[in-house]
Regions:
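Positively charged n-region of N-terminal signal peptides that target proteins for export
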Residues: 1-5
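Hydrophobic helical h-region of N-terminal Sec-dependent signal peptides
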Residues: 6-15, 263
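Core dinuclear metal-dependent hydrolase active-site scaffold
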Residues: 20-88, 150-214, 275-296
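Active-site environment of divalent metal-dependent phosphoester hydrolases
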Residues: 51-53, 71-73, 97-103, 126-129, ...
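Active-site metal-binding motif and surrounding structural segment of the metallo-beta-lactamase
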Residues: 60-64, 72-121, 208-225, 237-241
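Metal-dependent catalytic neighborhoods of phosphoester/phosphodiester hydrolases
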Residues: 102-114, 128-138, 230-234, 252-256
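Short acidic-hydrophobic, aromatic-tinged amphipathic segments that line or gate anion-handling sites
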Residues: 147-152, 267-271
Length: 296
């Protein structure tokens, strides 16, 4: 049965004009209206990679990924890409170089399974991380002749008819807090992908960007392990919160926390099953698959 989450946004505050965004929670893609097959849409797929980030964006015949999950889950990523018939990725956007965000990209670039047009990172090619994943990624781009592009705060990208805006905190507070966050906008629909920013950076975002953070969909920062401050909730005002983690492992973002701090918001844990979010720029349809079982 289709469940409707009523979402009435004052779009004057967003600068988007008078519009109403509605979010529908459905059992599966079969519940999406048939005429949507002919529409120009944006699809956000949050792959079940346990407690790691791996997201696929598709719009206008183009596809990209934001983070890749741990390398051991790469076959789940490939199965998702292959299921969509994706053979080319316009961008591999790495928010920061922790293994649970970057390791899978290293495998993907060496796999030769997909054409990769560019690897995007907030770090320079000479940046050194202690675990060495960034250096491995830089080496892979050179070996496979993949353009390496450093991205920074305020940069804009396009994917089909979607616009992506990069947000990044300049404070020297560690690579998690300096993750390259990404606001994805398609028509009046907005999804904010936050990397691993923590409480301190969320407060800085709220004070610095204010209403620019408004979104319908929010990726819970740092796998639900970070306390989300009220100021960040006030500026983002999401109707859907998804956590790239298993519900049993998310210590800060829980059903009880959402009930108290984001009443009415829907909560998904993509570590409990891949979550897919589809929009035509006005409405969202969201569904979740069962927990992924790796083939034997």
């Amino acid at each position: 049965m289709k469940r409707k989450l009523l979402l009435m946004l004052l779009c004057a505050a967003l600068g988007l004009g008078a519009a109403q965004v509605e979010v529908y929670r459905v059992e599966n893609e079969k519940d999406v209206p048939a005429d949507w097959a002919e529409k120009d849409t944006l699809r956000l797929t949050c792959i079940d990679t346990n407690r790691s980030d791996a997201m696929v964006l598709q719009s206008g015949g183009e596809a990209m990924m934001v983070d890749s999950g741990e390398g051991r889950y790469r076959k789940r990523v490939y199965a998702t890409l292959d299921g969509y018939g994706i053979t080319e990725l316009k961008y591999l956007l790495n928010t920061h170089c922790d293994d649970d965000h970057l390791h899978g990209f290293i495998y993907l670039m060496y796999s030769d399974l997909y054409q990769v047009d560019a690897f995007l990172s907030p770090n320079t090619t000479t940046y050194v991380d202690e675990e060495g994943y960034h250096q491995q990624a830089v080496k892979a781009t050179g070996t496979k002749n993949i353009p390496y592009v450093q991205i920074g705060d305020g940069d804009e990208l396009t994917l089909g008819n979607a616009k992506l805006t990069i947000f990044r905190c300049p404070l020297p507070t560690g690579q998690n807090n300096r993750s390259a966050a990404c606001m994805v906008q398609f028509g009046d629909s907005r999804a904010f992908l936050t990397g691993d920013i923590d409480n301190e950076t969320m407060q800085w975002y709220a004070a610095t960007y204010g209403e620019k953070l408004r979104c319908d969909i929010l990726k819970a920062p740092h796998h639900g392990l970070a306390t989300i401050p009220d100021s960040f909730v006030e500026q983002t005002q999401p109707q859907v919160l998804f956590v790239p983690n298993r519900s049993a492992l998310s210590t800060k973002v829980t059903a009880g926390w959402v009930k108290n701090h984001m009443p009415g918001a829907a909560l998904y844990f993509s570590g409990d099953g891949t979550a897919t979010m589809l929009t035509d720029g006005t409405d969202w349809y969201i569904w979740q698959e069962p927990n992924y079982v790796d083939p034997q």
